[in-house]
């Protein structure tokens, strides 16, 4: 997937880029189901709220096939490489599962 000039300009001016059609609704639903499967398993990479609700799943690309594919998918990787002008690799990957009305706040970040 190649970004157009306007998308590249927006990223450099505003610091973000939203690509709502990058993945199909079916692909998104598949990943949502994969995430639910990850949250249902008790493993050290899945951090939980005091209530037991999942908060974050770290490194899912290393133990889940769906998220492994996502982490290497050209529609995700190629636009980022285009923006940064160099090859990249997955350094950190997490899925935030903050349940509404449950758990601690998320700290501001960039």
Question: Where do the protein language model's features map onto the residues?
Answer:
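Non-heme Fe(II)-dependent double-stranded beta-helix
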Residues: 1-14, 19-110
